[in-house]
Amino acid sequence: MACMHQAQLYNDLEELLTGPSVPIVAGAAGAAALTAYINAKYHIAHDLKTLGGGLTQSSEAIDFINRRVAQKRVLTHHIFQEQVQKQSNHPFLIFEGKTWSYKEFSEAYTRVANWLIDELDVQVGEMVAIDGGNSAEHLMLWLALDAIGAATSFLNWNLTGAGLIHCIKLCECRFVIADIDIKANIEPCRGELEETGINIHYYDPSFISSLPNNTPIPDSRTENIELDSVRGLIYTSGTTGLPKGVFISTGRELRTDWSISKYLNLKPTDRMYTCMPLYHAAAHSLCTASVIHGGGTVVLSRKFSHKKFWPEVVASEANIIQYVGELGRYLLNGPKSPYDRAHKVQMAWGNGMRPDVWEAFRERFNIPIIHELYAATDGLGSMTNRNAGPFTANCIALRGLIWHWKFRNQEVLVKMDLDTDEIMRDRNGFAIRCAVNEPGQMLFRLTPETLAGAPSYYNNETATQSRRITDVFQKGDLWFKSGDMLRQDAEGRVYFVDRLGDTFRWKSENVSTNEVADVMGTFPQIAETNVYGVLVPGNDGRVRSLNCHGRRRDRVDIRFAALAKHARDRLPGYAVPLFLRVTPALEYTGTLKIQKGRLKQEGIDPDKISGEDKLYWLPPGSDIYLPFGKMEWQGIVDKRIRL
């Protein structure tokens, strides 16, 4: 990686082995001591384990893929059916107190699969959109579509209006199959969808259980599916202002899910609890599909709840829980309970555990392993940290000598101009590698061999190409931009710093600043908008902040109640701006790009706000934006006010 130079590492190793500072030792004890010292300093054993694990393109992974292709069994459905053959009565799913064995769940989704064929005439390779909250039926629909060789468009059930219509049209589907519980989000869009030939069907438990045809789906239906075929779309917010569909190929899903299962060493005795939404890759791939590969049990919650989380974990006897960073903080902020340590959890697996939460979470809930993953649905490459002690607490990876020897020119941290979010270049026009402990954007090298597997956005070549950059270190080279700021310390520990650009995370969701700005900009009294995320004490992610100025006659007299209603009627709850900064004029760069750097740095601390700018906020439970001053700020700092 950029922060540790290969030549220096070799020099260090040579000095270690030959320099006068190393005492002369003899015999087995001396050799063992020297080996231990080298291992501790250069993380040799850690690198060997990492490079041989499931998350690297090892020979074992290649053999697995080749074997599945030869067998013509490359789908998750095929893996599931093999578990049915091996352990038909073993529990696959626990949901709201009910348990399905692998055999029972197979029979259930087979009935759904036959309905898709018999009633809807869904074809092999056809895309079908499913929209709904976490439920057994949602999983049945996904596996049923997989079983018949169709692809699944996983819609975010929070979406409505233009965002929902955009996602449905993007995936070019004939059918949207939606949970009856979110009918209110779907029906306002029915007219426009039906005009383009899209049909809407609703499901609930009674409908799914009433389906009669349980004829096994013939293997011949899916035997010709190729690895590069589309298996699904998972949506992410981006700088275009509307969600983008990340293309999940059959090969990527097979390789990723097997790799995670292998890396975590998932077994039939494992039970993984998740309350993450099934339309996200976290619950879909990092939990459900990976557990299927391992033959274990998925413990699914409908959604996160302080009251239900630990009781469900305890009752299900889960030994692994899945988290995102915010979840750890929410649980810590909850009242202490006898359930806190009454569970059997040995590992918390997820991404985004914040440094101020990490050790407090482990200590309070007595969880030995915090297993942090750095990856993204639309990203390339991944990092992991299986943390069991203080040395690697709070980081996303540990890189040693062997890793740097092999990958230092494949993954590189480069310096960034944080005002423009552009890569800084030297006088020759090439990127500048970061020094030790210097934050920079992570770039992943693209070669002819890796280009085919690089992430892409469905039907959006412009967005796909925007993640790639050329002439980074030499003319003609090609790299993938992660969009994330990371840093590496002198010990080889890698830390997540922040997200770049026009997307930030809040409550496990990616929020597009352009999408929010477009919606808020249609309010009659607002002339221009600048949306950005600000850090708030005691909260993970960034809170939505809207910098705006009114039309001249309305500069002061903005109707704040109407503005709040305007936002809530048109945006998902997690995207509604919580803070307003009303200013006489927006600031632009020389190339007419809106300035965000100073606004992000000043945040919502009233003492840092200068000039004529005024702050407002939307308090929890309020229907109107109210003035935000020192008293409200102190309430957030003291954690008396929670967002």
UniProtKB/Swiss-Prot annotation:
Q: How does it sit in the membrane?
A: Multi-pass membrane protein
MF (Gene Ontology):
ATP binding; long-chain fatty acid transmembrane transporter activity; long-chain fatty acid-CoA ligase activity
Intramembrane spans? 250-318
Q: Where in the cell is it found?
A: Lipid droplet; Cell membrane; Peroxisome membrane; Peroxisome
Q: What class of enzyme is it?
A: ligase
Stretches assigned to the Cytoplasmic side: 1-15, 160-249, 319-643
Q: Name one GO cellular component term.
A: cytoplasmic side of plasma membrane
Main localisation: other
Where are its TM segments located? 16-36, 139-159
Which chemical reaction does it catalyze?
a very long-chain fatty acid + ATP + CoA = a very long-chain fatty acyl-CoA + AMP + diphosphate
Q: Name one GO biological process term.
A: long-chain fatty acid import into cell
Residue positions of motif FACS: 477-525
Recorded hits in CDD domains, A to Z, give:
FATP_chFAT1_like
Per the record, the similarity remark reads: Belongs to the ATP-dependent AMP-binding enzyme family.
The entry's function note states: Acyl-CoA synthetase required for both the import of long chain fatty acids (LCFAs) (C14-C18) and the activation very long chain fatty acids (VLCFAs) (C20-C26) by esterification of the fatty acids into metabolically active CoA-thioesters for subsequent degradation or incorporation into phospholipids. The transport and fatty acyl-CoA synthetase activities are genetically separable and are thus independent activities. Esterifies VLCFAs in the peroxisome matrix. The VLCFAs are actively transported into peroxisomes by a PXA1-PXA2 heterodimeric transporter in the peroxisomal membrane.
Task: Output this protein's name.
Answer: Very long-chain fatty acid transport protein
The protein's organism comes out as: Cochliobolus heterostrophus
The gene behind this protein is FAT1
